[in-house]
Amino acid sequence: NIGVVQTRWSHINRDYSILTQIQAFALDAHFTLEQVGRNSKNHFMNFNGTAGIWRKTCIIDSGNWQGDTLTEDLDLSYRAQLKKWKFKYLEDVETPSELPIVISAIRSQQFRWNKGGAENFQKMSKNVIHAKNLPLITKVHSILHLLNSTMFLNVFFVGVLSIPMLYIKNEWGHLSLYYDLSSLFIVSTLIFFGCYWVLYRYSKGGGFLNFLEFTKIFFTFYTVAMGFSFHNALAVLEGHIGKKSDFIRTPKFNVLTIKKSLKYNKYTRKKVSKNTIFEGLL
């Protein structure tokens, strides 16, 4: 009773810039780790908005397409799976996609994805918890999946508090035991690093040089994620409190190399917001 077939995104402009490289880096992990894992264990997964096909009867049976969240594909995915429709993920089938290449487009896409995730937690979490004949482990996994974007609240506060914590540690040295215990949280970063390395090695191969290249892109990705944490945290907060906003589409430029100019492209924004400056400082 398959309702959806989802394929893996490939990226036609992966090597356009460092921004497209780290986006591809993160999305590759989503598809090859998260989607493969969820589907293989029969946990709830999400349709990715494109690169797949829906059965019409599945859409209708699940309550049709609804526009009350910014990630309506995630919303419909959960409603369909609560109706016992099956999803099929094809890791070996690549569908070419284009990554956003300018900051304004990346920010609007990230805002939509992260706010939509929070909106869907508010909309779907109770339905998941109270669903009959749904294994407890699947319920737990689904709730954590819906809370995925909420991690940016934690990332933002950790980043902002890191500087005053250095002062506090210096002034209240008698609390050194607590500071030492807090360093255990680095284990989560090491796990994160290890998971991404396994995936990178799977696609690019092992070896010392590949490991060096991976380390460079991983910490670049980590740094940019920290910079985006303020913007994404605002999106998550809006999603949880129910503040509505317009669906802003991600512009496509059909630009595959840095040599092609964007000077006259109507989607290129020249103004830089104050939030963007703050993100750069982060």
PLM feature spans:
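Long helical/loop segments within the catalytic core of UDP-sugar-dependent glycosyltransferases
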Residues: 2-70, 82, 103-136, 140-143, ...
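Short, well-ordered loop/turn and helix-capping segments at boundaries between secondary-structure elements
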Residues: 24, 28, 86, 95, ...
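Catalytic donor-sugar/metal-binding loop of nucleotide-sugar-dependent glycosyltransferases
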Residues: 42, 68, 77-96
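Conserved glycosyltransferase catalytic-site signature
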Residues: 70-75, 220
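Hydrophobic alpha-helical transmembrane segments
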Residues: 85-102, 124-135, 159-169, 220-230, ...
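Nucleotide-sugar-dependent glycosyltransferase catalytic core
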Residues: 98-115, 210-213, 244-262
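Loop-to-transmembrane boundary segments
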Residues: 131-154, 254-282
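Membrane-embedded multi-pass helical conduit in multi-pass membrane proteins
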Residues: 145-252, 274-282
